[in-house]
Amino acid sequence: MAHLTASQRDSLVAVVEAVLPAGRFLPAGSAATVDRVDSFVGTLPSPLQRGLGGLLAALDVSALVHGRRTFARLPVATRLAVLERWRTGDPVRRLALRALTTPLKLAHFDDPALYDRLGCVYSTTVRPEPKPAWFSQRVHGKLDRDESIECDVVVIGTGAGGAVVARELAETGVAVVMIEEGHYFDRSQFTGRPFQMQQRLYRRGGSTFAFGNTPIPIPLGQTVGGTTTVNSGTCYRTPDRVLAAWDRELGLHALAPAAMVPYFDRVEAVLEVARAKPELLGGNGRVIARGANALGLVHHGPLLRNAPACDGQGVCCFGCPTDAKRSTNVSYVPLALRAGAELFTAARVGRILVEGGRARGVVATSGGHTLTVRARAVVVACGALLTPLLLADNGVRAAQLGKNLSIHPACGALAEFDEPIASWRGIPQGYMIEDLHDEGILYEGAAVPLEFSMTMTPLIGPELVRLAEAFDRVASFGFMVEDTSRGSVHQIGGQLVVRYWLGDADVAHLKRGLDVLAQIYFAAGARRVHFPVAGFDVLASVDDLAAFRRANLHAWDIDVTAYHPLGTARMGVDAQSSVIDADHQVHGAPGLYVVDGAAVPTAIGVNPQVTIMALATRAADRIAAALG
């Protein structure tokens, strides 16, 4: 089914022809590009679909002002000039062009012919594995009739929180039912095609945003395994200084560093955490190590990961095609099922049952039918953006619910070298630099496939195509910031709305992070560095950093992403300043627990999956004790 109108389609073809011209050996964008965009548009919520139409209408107005014709009727060179005015113009036009060109870049480079011409690996063929007999007895797809069942604990969500609670409880003999809104994909369905898998595995096709003084994408997994299925596999324990602060400032004495060690140990044993193998760090790791050494940095090397059998397929964030990454769809969920838990997929929970003031189950819908699960306890593990909405819909009125959102704002840069990089070979996020971690900046490898790499630069037209044709010599690396800014989540007209205002201190950290990253690149021998920063698209040498340092940057000048939403139902001992207690139970709501990123009290400055899993392991112990 077509999602674009005929006029929108014509306008997008005209944009594609200007943004993506033919290169020395890469073909130009065409109507086929727009065909792929059309399928992507279908994954967007209606407000974003309407926003796309508004952008195209605004483009026509701009064209009429400057060229007295609609955009599609302008010569290609004039179209490019109009778009360049947007690219170098005020923040509104710059952000509008980013929103317009990002799906076009993704769709255009999602083409096996382009990958072949660049020598990249486009997709992966995976041999399917037979499921064990118990699998079909424990996993249920869409319902074909109304059902009502009973258990001890019902868990909503199968990510880093829900899957861990389910496994830990099931292995103690507790009857557990897991309910997951997404589907249970196996590795044979992980094709290695990034744009395709993004639409299949991510909520809204990857188009979840925070809005404030700049739009920030926050991609969320929507599948069994949640975001663990589509994350990088990086494993950090919560820093001791963070745990100590929770103990000292929030009264969470049970989370003191020494108290949490056994839970980290248990999680890491299941995940089989180990350092990334040096031979799989690829060209990115090689040049970053060289640059870091040249600058005298000392705290850098292979990252800890949950993929001991990794062979460097390079598509961690789009479903591991070898099952080497021990995301919860591969580790904790099967362990829970083997221990007797049941799983319902493609089911959405809307109602939490309350009897006598206590949570007693849930009602979910699937395939037009109703699933009622009666239980002694309910665990909500929908993630930091969605858990508050479900709780609010079911009468939880905690003052802090939906507030205190931290996201670890992230940024990255590309660099061109004279040597082969071949970033598609090896672990995408396998290397780290911790020298600036005490400042709140953590560097981690961020090699991404061709189509996503091209969205990391605001370049359009011939310069963009020149960069794409040099992709085998392009490195990418990134970092995240331990944010002091805070946001909130809301539901407006049935739609998730995330608000987040990026503060000056975090903007300064992003600027500092980019500055040091450029120094690392140039020290490693980079010819050019590409920043996602207005006015500083391309740096030709380290001398160009002088102007960058003097620049008074604002949030809207930097393209920022985020992957770690936390804190929207945070833990604490005071019901006025938190949503759940130290046992993960919602204040004033017996039997109702929150076990996911929403529970994490503050930003932690590292990838949070191990933190969430360790807290979930502890939560399972507390829930089991409460059940008796």
Each model region followed by its residue ranges:
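Conserved redox-cofactor binding core of oxidoreductases
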Residues: 108, 118-142, 253-350, 359, ...
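Glycine-rich loop(s) and the adjacent beta-strand/alpha-helix scaffold that form part
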Residues: 168-194, 217, 223, 338, ...
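FAD cofactor-binding and catalytic pocket of flavoenzymes
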Residues: 231, 398-521, 554-556, 562-567, ...
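Near-N-terminal "mature-domain entry" segment
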Residues: 1-70, 74
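A conserved FAD-binding loop/helix module that cradles the flavin
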Residues: 602-623
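Extreme N-terminal leader/targeting segments of oxidoreductases
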Residues: 2-6, 19, 27-35, 39-46, ...
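Redox-cofactor-proximal catalytic regions of oxidoreductases
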Residues: 196-276, 320, 476-486
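N-terminal Rossmann-like FAD-binding beta1-loop-alpha1 element of flavoenzymes
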Residues: 151-178
